[in-house]
From Swiss-Prot:
This is Large ribosomal subunit protein bL25. InterPro entries: Rbsml_bL25/Gln-tRNA_synth_N, Ribosomal_bL25/Gln-tRNA_synth, Ribosomal_bL25_b-dom, Ribosomal_bL25_C, Ribosomal_bL25_long, Ribosomal_L25_dom, Ribosomal_uL5_bac-type. One of its GO terms (cellular component) is cytosolic large ribosomal subunit. Gene3D superfamilies: Ribosomal protein L25, beta domain, Ribosomal Protein L25, Chain P. It comes from the Bacteria. It comes from Herpetosiphon aurantiacus (strain ATCC 23779 / DSM 785 / 114-95). Part of the 50S ribosomal subunit; part of the 5S rRNA/L5/L18/L25 subcomplex. Contacts the 5S rRNA. Binds to the 5S rRNA independently of L5 and L18. Belongs to the bacterial ribosomal protein bL25 family. CTC subfamily.
């Protein structure tokens, strides 16, 4: 499912360097804006509003930027820096993209549904590949790639990249034979086999 475009109101930022701490003390987050075809510039945003938007968008959600004196821009979150003690976001970078040109992004895999064998303790799900590389127009980028965990009913069954079902507007760039998910024995059941082999 493609993303709903989120909106973020930014203000130009003139304060840089160590002085940006004064902004953080006021609940204002310093932002860096970059992207192909634009001159990088500094901005700032209300910290609470930013956290609200980013909690929904993550790294694959399209964000429409509103900046006084500038034309409409759309962007993806590129990077965040956090305080090592409090884990509070202290700086973020946004990457402006062309809404009409394809982008390449890593999209997280999300397991959906309940697997009966796992629930009974007879198996474990092994997520081998947690992100999938895709190419799509910014407005068509999926927020996540859902996989039905209940579809695996026997030990050894697998889900590969070629088994994924995505809209025609989204191109998967990973090798089609890449393993994503497998249903295996619980570790406790594998141990006896390993001991037998050792003997």
């Amino acid at each position: 499912m493609a993303n709903e475009t989120l909106r973020l109101a930014l203000q130009p930022r003139e304060i840089t360097g160590k002085k940006v701490q004064s902004l953080r003390d006021q609940g204002i987050l310093p932002i860096g804006i970059c992207g192909r075809g634009i001159e990088p510039y500094s901005a700032q945003v209300d910290e609470r509003e930013f956290n609200k938007v980013i909690n929904q968008a993550g790294y694959s959600g399209l964000i429409e930027l509103s900046i006084p004196g500038q034309k409409r821009q759309v962007a993806f979150l590129l990077e965040v820096q956090r305080n090592s003690v409090t884990n509070r976001i202290i700086h973020a970078d946004l990457r402006v993209v062309d809404a009409n040109a394809p982008v390449e992004l890593d999209i997280h895999v999300a397991l959906q549904g309940e697997n009966d064998m796992v629930s009974r303790g007879n198996a474990v799900l092994n997520l081998v590949q947690s992100v999938i590389r895709v190419r799509a127009l910014p407005g068509d980028v999926p927020h996540q790639i859902d996989i039905d965990a209940s579809s695996l009913t026997e030990i050894g069954q697998q889900i590969l990249v070629k088994d994924l079902s995505l809209p025609a507007t989204v191109e998967i760039l990973d090798d089609v034979e890449t393993l994503i998910l497998t249903l295996g024995y619980p570790q406790a059941e594998e141990a006896p086999a390993a001991e037998t082999a050792a003997e």
